[in-house]
Amino acid sequence: MDYATAIGGVAMFTLIIMGLVAIILAARSRLVSSGDVTIHINDNPENDVVTPAGGKLLQTLASEGIFLSSACGGGGTCAQCRCRVIEGGGSILPTEEGYFTQGEIRNHMRLACQVAVKQDMKIEIDPEFFDVQKWECEVISNDNVATFIKELVLKIPDGEEVNFRAGGYVQLEAPPHEVHYKDFDIAEEYQDDWNNFGIFKYVSKVDEPVIRAYSMANYPDEKGLIKFNIRIASPPPRGPDGIPPGKMSSWTFSLKPGDKVTVSGPYGEFFAKKTEAEMIFVGGGAGMAPMRSHIFDQLKRLNSDRKISFWYGARSIREMFYVEDYDQLEEEFANFEWHVALSDPLPEDNWDGYTGFIHNVLLEEYLKDHPNPEDCEYYMCGPPMMNAAVIDMLHSMGVEDENIMLDDFGG
């Protein structure tokens, strides 16, 4: 090969490479958005947002101080960040289709966490999201109230207020972290169970921020704080190896007084109906949180004269909490009563109250002799199996879904 031929070959190769680079850059300019776009919200120019293109709609709105509900933190699994994307959102993705009916899809319903912001958009969101705020709160206390449940109490910043309705929830944000269960502050009376189940051995390591939703246990007149009942989500004791512990619950169990926690909210759908119907609350485990919020709100803030009862299921006396609170309410308000059923009472409990699963106790001890159970309103929050059993029982008694209110978070 002579020198001229070699030079020509190099030149041709260089031209080919430059041509490919030009094609890639041209394609990238068409596929990757850049510059600013305008998001028109709720057909109100005052709500317009001008923002850089390129992110997802959920995070883009959050960067502008508009916090849509997202218990999974934008992972596409909770389906809470529902909104209507009228223009500019492209076609619905397969990851979204399972969360909507065909009618909702035709009405342009989308999950904000799955919608890419590439061009000017026209969307509709719940007006309540404009009232959602974010605070850096401080841990007041984080004490065991049951074997695997802690009551986390946060102080909101001075001068701030969480304008929520009973039954509402907020989102907690955990930073990347590594926590060791052996470092948890667990009350002495519960440590034997933690040792027996081998829970202290776990480590939770999280490399990115985590967001989860938790129902509030306080009611609106308990101001200046936010209260939660959080159950540790440790791997099942007889499950396969390698199951990681819950990211958020592990972090919250590690919190100590003085620690900072980022909170956004309030959100909610699990609200009391404004009727005069009898209210029957059914709870179990950490599902206590919205039950407490609702019941205290009805009796102490609203001075409701509606007939109200609370039916709570626990394993043993050790798993009962807020007992003095409810006993005091029962003494103070003639229209309120509460009942506990223990599914597995310990010999030392010397328990002479109801035993068994709470849905069976509610049926046998109250509803089967109730003149009109279908006219009552039922509010429930607890473990999934409890929720399903209660709903099946209510359906068998002719209770319509419109009178069954379920909070899926607290259990």
From Swiss-Prot:
Membrane topology field: Single-pass membrane protein
Cofactor note: Binds 1 [2Fe-2S] cluster.
Subcellular locations according to the entry: Cell inner membrane
Cofactor: [2Fe-2S] cluster; FAD
EC number annotated for this UniProt entry: 7.2.1.1
Pfam families the record matches: FAD_binding_6, Fer2, NAD_binding_1
Source organism, top-level taxon: Bacteria
Entry annotated with the keyword Zinc-finger: no
GO biological process, one term: sodium ion transport
Gene3D superfamilies hit by this protein: 3.10.20.30, Nucleotide-binding domain of ferredoxin-NADP reductase (FNR) module, Translation factors
Residue ranges occupied by any FAD-binding FR-type domain in the UniProt entry: 132-273
Major subcellular site: membrane
Catalytic reaction equation(s): a ubiquinone + n Na(+)(in) + NADH + H(+) = a ubiquinol + n Na(+)(out) + NAD(+)
Record-listed [2Fe-2S] cluster binding positions: 72, 78, 81, 113
Keywords assigned: 2Fe-2S, Cell inner membrane, Cell membrane, FAD, Flavoprotein, Ion transport, Iron, Iron-sulfur, Membrane, Metal-binding, NAD, Sodium, Sodium transport, Translocase, Transmembrane, Transmembrane helix, Transport, Ubiquinone
Family: Belongs to the NqrF family.
Record's subunit section: Composed of six subunits; NqrA, NqrB, NqrC, NqrD, NqrE and NqrF.
Descriptive protein name: Na(+)-translocating NADH-quinone reductase subunit F
Species per Swiss-Prot/TrEMBL record: Psychrobacter cryohalolentis (strain ATCC BAA-1226 / DSM 17306 / VKM B-2378 / K5)
